[in-house]
Amino acid sequence: MKGLIYKNYLVTRKYYFMAFVFFFITALFMILIRLSMICGNISHDPEAVSDLTRTMWVFRYMPCAVVILGFAGYSEAFFADLNSGWARFSRTTSLSTHQIVGSYFLSEGIVLSFAYIICLLYLVIFCLSFGDKISLHYITNVTSLFCFGVIIQYFNLTLAMFAKKIQTVQLISVSIALIFQWLLCAYIYPRMEELENPDAVLLEWMAQQFEPIKAYIFPVMLLFAVIFTVGGYFISVKGLERRTF
């Protein structure tokens, strides 16, 4: 089991490294802006400081999304690993289908948990730079993002056990994203006509629109993460047993 997990890390190490680099660049960009607001050129312009403060609080979760979704948003390595045909020889060893699938799910769970810890540390530093305390609200938001990453990754893993080509998974994932975007636009755009200057107050207005459902986002994401983890595991076991390499 340990060998399978180590193999998964070797196969996907390039993607982990790229996601961490993008997170570091994004977080460093936010930190440099904050330093300039405190003791740099921007600090001499109160209006610019006020505008940037509001903007940074809107995009404060961007580095978290970069590292979590970066760790979860790939499938090429798993397809290359499965399509290499090595698993057919596992039938001549003591490895079971449950162990093979479990190694995929466990290795990705460990990596996403590591990304989650990094995001919490970043958020603590970000809040301290603004003189704010880390609260349960911030933790639940990052946890919701972590659950979303779990859903994406385990959904892709489950499809990888059935599909022979990565284009199939990409087509399904993009189709679901487009349907969700269409539903979101159908909800937002008719209501935007009521605004006199939508570009100026768009972010604040969108926050107000989603205020009634904000309390349900975390429990719903947590529930779906559990469903995709448990259900995806057993479905993946069946898919790998029926897979012809």
Predicted segments — roles?
Residues 1-85, 102-245:
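Hydrophobic alpha-helical transmembrane segments of membrane proteins
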Residues 91-97:
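Short helix-to-coil transition segments within interhelical loops
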